[in-house]
């Protein structure tokens, strides 16, 4: 459930409001479902190609405002549906080639997430989480939101966010059977991405 909607009007991502997702709420209520919500930090002209880690302050501010808007929408979804809304923060920020500076982008990324989570929300209803990734197309050499970054951010910001384990975003020798109990030694709750594959592969597959 990304922050993309079709309602006969254009609203840029830093201006989206709960009212734009009223149909989502109606759909979920009819089916007795809750909803999670993901900010959408990709496929937009203001990806330069970085978003929350961009050195361009105008670009970074745009995406911070998008994240804050998504926090407000997540609060709305949780209140309307009476269920916890997990708000997953993931960006594709990174570089195809080896960067000279590996710290600067992560400091900007941290600052941006700090600013997003300064938006008021009820942590009993909204559970922000930071998703990491090993690498991807276009970010083969450096991913800003690495596993170490995401887990350390969650550890240092209890009461504002929880860890998220995307069960495909690991190095080849790492396994979910070790990662989940290791996290549960320190956190009372974690979020997971899990897929049951049928006729296709996915980066979220686990063994049952």
Describe the predicted segments one by one.
Residues 1-20:
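Glycine-rich, proline-tolerant flexible connector loops at the mouths of alpha/beta enzymes
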Residues 2, 91, 196:
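Residues that line or immediately flank small-molecule/substrate-binding pockets and catalytic motifs
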Residues 7, 137, 172:
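Conserved protein kinase catalytic core
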Residues 14-158, 162:
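Active-site acidic/histidine proton-transfer and metal-coordination neighborhood
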Residues 169:
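Short, glycine/acidic-enriched loop or turn micro-motifs at the edges of active sites
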